[in-house]
Amino acid sequence: MKILIVGSGGREHALAWKAAQSPQVEQVFVAPGNGGTASEPGVENVAIAADDIAGLVEFARRESIGLTIVGPEAPLVLGLVDAFAEAGLPCFGPRQASAQLEGSKAFAKDFLHRHGIPTAAYGVFTELEPALAYLRQVGAPVVVKADGLAAGKGVILADDLATAEAAVHDMLGGGRFGRAGARVVIEEFLTGEEASFIAMVDGRHILPLASSQDHKARDDGDRGPNTGGMGAYSPAPIVTPEIHDRIMREVMEPTVAGLAAEGLPYLGFLYAGLMIGADGTPKVLEFNCRLGDPETQPLLMRLQSDLVELCLAALDGRLDQVTADWDARPALGVVMAAGGYPDDYETGHVISGLDAVPSSEAKVFQAGTRCEGDAILTNGGRVLCVTALGANVAEAQHLAYQAVDRIQWTDAFCRRDIGHRAIARERS
């Protein structure tokens, strides 16, 4: 079977790497891919953009692709899965109408409210003055979110009213994030510990994947601006068996049932970004209609089951008949980024040391990279995700940073404390 992975990030490198391990697979194509997928055994890049829906359909038809897995959110929101379905091509991901769950934060919040699924109190605004009046009413700290897709950067955690008002002015008055910021969600600032809960859904049945925890803030100690994610680990100790059951019962099951009841049956990866309160109550911060990045990298390091078989089972509506098996060892991934990220940064720097990382120590998933001759060059903000397994989170962290320290390019940086919460739990 031939497989097509859509996207160009570290998540897509991990998906291609895992799909190529399936005994059912003869060839994996990645459109457009990156420097890492270009050199992955059994994997080939295809020069088609992730949002070129007609081009992807034509390629999949021509190559008789047996399964397409969509990595990023933008093609889903543009209707890629709908186009593949019309062409009779198997594609794992939600249709455009269901992908509104990620494509519009206002849609997601209203959906949660309709179905009684726990989330933060909120207001939705398209006009500046009512938004500012609401801010003055609720006070700070508060969270300001662009309604549409903003590459993980459209969320402002405001500790004071001035920061919140500036964010609202930027979005509704200044055009920051363009159409994505033409409507804003202002919501209650929740406290607790974050966790990422990702499942596969076939329309009715839910197959939960292992838990994970992302690190959104750019700097150590969870400081600095929000990013697409600076590292992740799996499993997340905060998600105990009891909390896992609560998440399934209070969040995932009513979400899937609610979508079906509204005529939006959901098929694909469904990611709930959660805040776990001190009493164990899970509240939804956001939904993503795809795997998280960088959570995918440690998750797929741990997944022992055949990813392709799981996707095919979902397309057949039989996720209730399969299981996902996991390596008991934790995995941890550290994102190496370009200096200046998530703001302005340079590309085109040569990366050295990739060959110095032994495969027994870590796996380097490439994201913002490209090939030029024999060299790998930086080509984005988040450049690599260096991922390792360990007997515990502390060992996985040690091995990941040992590998990170072998890799260099001009102005590379990373957080040095990925996994700190889990390690504190291990030591307590």
Swiss-Prot record:
The pathway this protein participates in, as annotated, is: Purine metabolism; IMP biosynthesis via de novo pathway; N(1)-(5-phospho-D-ribosyl)glycinamide from 5-phospho-alpha-D-ribose 1-diphosphate: step 2/2
Residue span, ATP-grasp domain: 109-316
- Write down the PROSITE patterns for this protein, in alphabetical order: ATP_GRASP, GARS
Q: Which cysteines are joined by disulfide bonds?
A: none
Please name the GO terms that the record assigns under molecular function: ATP binding; metal ion binding; phosphoribosylamine-glycine ligase activity
Q: HAMAP family under this entry?
A: GARS
Q: What is this protein called?
A: Phosphoribosylamine--glycine ligase
Give the species this sequence originates from.
Allochromatium vinosum (strain ATCC 17899 / DSM 180 / NBRC 103801 / NCIMB 10441 / D) (Chromatium vinosum)
Please spell out the taxonomic lineage of the organism that makes this protein: Bacteria, Pseudomonadati, Pseudomonadota, Gammaproteobacteria, Chromatiales
